[in-house]
Swiss-Prot record:
SUPFAM superfamilies reported for this sequence: Ribosomal protein L16p/L10e
Gene3D superfamilies (alphabetical): Ribosomal protein L10e/L16
Keyword Heme belongs to the record: no
Gene that encodes it: RPL10
GO molecular function, one term: structural constituent of ribosome
Name of the protein: Large ribosomal subunit protein uL16
Origin: domain of life: Eukaryota
Alphabetical list of InterPro entries matching this protein: Ribosomal_uL16, Ribosomal_uL16_CS_euk_arc, Ribosomal_uL16_dom, Ribosomal_uL16_euk_arch, Ribosomal_uL16_sf
Keyword set, alphabetical order: Ribonucleoprotein, Ribosomal protein
Subunit structure: Component of the small ribosomal subunit. Mature ribosomes consist of a small (40S) and a large (60S) subunit. The 40S subunit contains about 33 different proteins and 1 molecule of RNA (18S). The 60S subunit contains about 49 different proteins and 3 molecules of RNA (25S, 5.8S and 5S).
Family recorded in the similarity comment: Belongs to the universal ribosomal protein uL16 family.
GO terms for cellular component: ribonucleoprotein complex; ribosome
Amino acid sequence: MGRRPGRCYRYLSKKAYPKSRFNRGVPDSKIQIFDLGRRKAGVLEFPLLVNCISNERENLSAEALEAARICANKYMVKHAGKDNFHLRIRVYPFHVLRINKMLSCAGADRLQTGMRGSFGKPYGRAARVVFNQPILSIRTKESFRDAAVEALRRAKNKFPGHQKIQVSSKFGFTNMFSDEFNKLNESGRIILRGGSFSVIREKGSIDKFKRDLEYAANN
């Protein structure tokens, strides 16, 4: 039996149905890798952020997410190099899809009960997305802006519905806008911690505030 078309499971018609002790025998997700490229790059190395954002409420199957991941990664490796970007899948397929298998042979009505007891058995997984929710994100250098936009444009063709490509005003994968981050970094108020960072706030003891400023200046 072939795989049922994705259009059968596209819309969010009911509440989520995750794996639990009541929902056993769920197949493994087709997507297992959610971060690709140079994952351990520092915050300052990749200041540009490009997002693929959903314009609909819908289900995205794990197979579609895996296809989009492969497509975007392949394009970025070819046009930017494997060490010049960090690709991240922003959703996870928690929702379990069900199927009520029906026979289509002669005399099928004698062998099955039709729509009686039609709850179905676990069949696959999908991620539930809503309006303006990021699906994929790429942080990279400013010189590879066009490559990142094109990679996500190709990846969104693997999804149903409508998506848009957004060049974000955030600084990389941080939660701060680029202007604010650069201003704090120039004033020595940012402590870099590899792929993350801390902001030195004007609170707490004066001694700790001075120590943090000195640590940020030396690093």
